[in-house]
């Protein structure tokens, strides 16, 4: 609360958009928060995208895949499969339902056992050779189950699929290192990490391979009246004026979690 309040009182200006002192201070605070988030999950700064929520982060990935050029790595067709689990939050289920509907891809899922765990007994028949995406929660917000990522990630990568991880519950409650997890995309929200509402995070080392999600200011490299080129990630996915104070507040929350 103090971090957000101080930002609004003393540093409030649109980031990346001015050469005056206030804009420079705002940009430094915003990018400082990005560095804190990156360090907290073992990532690089340019792999961190600020969104308004984990829901938006997951939708960003699914929507961008739906916009991928045919024949590129993330383009899906009716010959492809998307895998989720029965324990997913709606934020990590419905975007993939919609992507399957848009592209004709088949949606499949891991079932949950009576003990509240994923049934991996048929992992090879769920994650098949034609699977392009495996999306799952790290820790269930309903059951508390911590999913066994190692086997799932290994099988997904064996068939060339990417793994999208909903880490909303795990990031605030346990050490999370994206390199050790081996996943390809990871999302979490600010408010579940004792931070503000209105801010979320998307991490990936593959961001520059995806097309943009939104278009507008701050995300372009060049623009004419007939065309535009995109800035490099993460700015490519941060169109418009971002939730600056909320990002700074999340940075303060990360400081708190780091100190526990």
Question: Which ranges hold each PLM region?
Answer:
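Pyridoxal 5′-phosphate
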Residues: 1-260
